[in-house]
Amino acid sequence: MSLNITENESISTAVIDAINSGATLKDINAIPDDMMDDIYSYAYDFYNKGRIEEAEVFFRFLCIYDFYNVDYIMGLAAIYQIKEQFQQAADLYAVAFALGKNDYTPVFHTGQCQLRLKAPLKAKECFELVIQHSNDEKLKIKAQSYLDAIQDIKE
């Protein structure tokens, strides 16, 4: 099947219009939610079994096809954190926080990444935000533990 230039331009325009209106590749390709859930299950299973490279492939796919799903972004961020790619992880955690609104889990993990990036003041800001704004008491306790541990560190 060959497409002429006009057909290619029409398809390109339709895809760009769809993306500009907020559609994801999942939507454009009509991938059902249950299929995405199955792929997520594989990614999560690989992650839990320590098969990080395989998990990364699946989480990358999920993020590319549905960049609005916080679980997919958190999964890929966790992979980067495990692989000690802390700046990439922190960047993805920031996206997850922006999409997730009131869930401060990504902010907590950003704080962990900032510590590993040797930026204790940034880490402190993250942990303080968690304590001030999170509704998750367990997460607040963890954040306070980090704050207590780094209280005397200067950048």
UniProtKB/Swiss-Prot annotation:
InterPro entries: T3SS_Ca_resp_chp_LcrH/SycD, T3SS_Ca_resp_chp_LcrH/SycD_sub, TPR-3, TPR-like_helical_dom_sf
Species annotation: Shigella flexneri
Record-given protein name: Chaperone protein IpgC
MF terms in GO: identical protein binding
Top-rank taxon: Bacteria
Name of the gene encoding the protein in the UniProt record: ipgC
Paired cysteines (S-S): none
Transmembrane stretches, start-end: none
GO cellular component, one term: cytoplasm
Subcellular location field: Cytoplasm
Entry's family note: Belongs to the LcrH/SycD chaperone family.
Keywords, in A-Z order: Chaperone, Cytoplasm, Plasmid, Virulence
Main subcellular location: cytoplasm
Role played: Assists the correct folding of nascent IpaB. Once it is bound to IpaB, it binds to IpaC and impedes their premature association that would lead to their degradation in the absence of IpcG.
Entry keyword tRNA-binding: no
